[in-house]
């Protein structure tokens, strides 16, 4: 599928995340994807509300179409914590600390959730796309250069995200599922979006 000249800014300064998103979207994504690092405030609240507000703020900064992503890692024994605050928890405690949070609990189950939010520009409607993968928290295994991937083992697999072949991971991951929903929306609304993004 040929790409239109319209570009969507994916707000991230994380090169690995950008690479993974580009791999998942593939050549069939109808719009050019650029990226930009914007220092958005660390918001508190429910994950979908955080994504919407980040998208609104990013669109105002970029003055055009944007995509933002918010990722949560939710421990069932802790009623969903760390949730959207996982980046802060990981920075402060490391992989061992994440495991230690569950040391007193027999339930190590967790789910990874990704919410992409998209808007065509400032003041326009914001669409959200939620992807979720169930799994469990395990001692870190595999490369440690991509967030909490080494401690999350998805249900039905013996490997952590960090140990998995990237193609397999992208096909079952929370991010892959969220982007699949986003792509379905873009396919359904392609003509309408092309007009809005060309304006």
UniProtKB/Swiss-Prot annotation:
It holds the Pfam family Ham1p_like. It is found in: Cytoplasm. Mg(2+) binds at residue 42. GO terms for biological process: deoxyribonucleoside triphosphate catabolic process; nucleoside triphosphate catabolic process; nucleotide metabolic process. Its main location: cytoplasm. Binds 1 divalent metal cation per subunit; can use either Mg(2+) or Mn(2+). GO terms for cellular component: cytoplasm. Its cofactor is Mg(2+); Mn(2+). InterPro entries: ITPase (IPR027502), ITPase-like_fam (IPR029001), RdgB/HAM1 (IPR002637). Keywords: Cytoplasm, Hydrolase, Magnesium, Manganese, Metal-binding, Nucleotide metabolism, Nucleotide-binding. Disulfide bonds: none annotated. It catalyses: ITP + H2O = IMP + diphosphate + H(+); dITP + H2O = dIMP + diphosphate + H(+); XTP + H2O = XMP + diphosphate + H(+). GO terms for molecular function: dITP diphosphatase activity; ITP diphosphatase activity; metal ion binding; nucleoside triphosphate diphosphatase activity; nucleotide binding; XTP diphosphatase activity. The keyword Manganese applies. ITP binds at residues 12-17, 54, 70-71, 87, 146-149, 169, 174-175. SUPFAM superfamilies: ITPase-like. PANTHER family: INOSINE TRIPHOSPHATE PYROPHOSPHATASE, INOSINE TRIPHOSPHATE PYROPHOSPHATASE/HAM1 PROTEIN. This is Inosine triphosphate pyrophosphatase. It comes from Monosiga brevicollis.
């Amino acid at each position: 599928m040929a790409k239109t000249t319209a570009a969507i800014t994916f707000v991230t300064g994380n090169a690995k995340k950008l690479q993974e998103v580009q791999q998942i979207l593939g050549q069939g994504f109808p719009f050019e994807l650029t990226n930009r690092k914007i220092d958005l405030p660390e918001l508190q609240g429910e994950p979908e509300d955080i994504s919407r507000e980040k998208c609104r703020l990013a669109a105002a900064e970029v003055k055009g179409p944007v995509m933002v992503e918010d990722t949560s890692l939710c421990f069932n024994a802790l009623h969903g914590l760390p949730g959207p605050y996982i980046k802060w928890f990981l920075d402060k405690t490391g992989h061992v600390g994440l495991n230690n949070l569950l040391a007193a609990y027999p339930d190590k189950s967790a789910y990874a959730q990704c919410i992409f939010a998209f808007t065509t520009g400032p003041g326009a409607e914001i669409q959200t796309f939620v992807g979720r993968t169930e799994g469990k928290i395990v001692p870190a295994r595999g490369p440690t250069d991509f967030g909490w991937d080494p401690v999350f083992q998805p249900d039905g697999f013996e490997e952590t995200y960090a140990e998995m072949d990237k193609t397999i991971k992208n096909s079952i991951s929370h991010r892959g599922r969220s982007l699949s929903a986003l792509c379905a929306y873009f396919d359904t609304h392609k003509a309408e979006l092309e007009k809005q993004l060309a304006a």
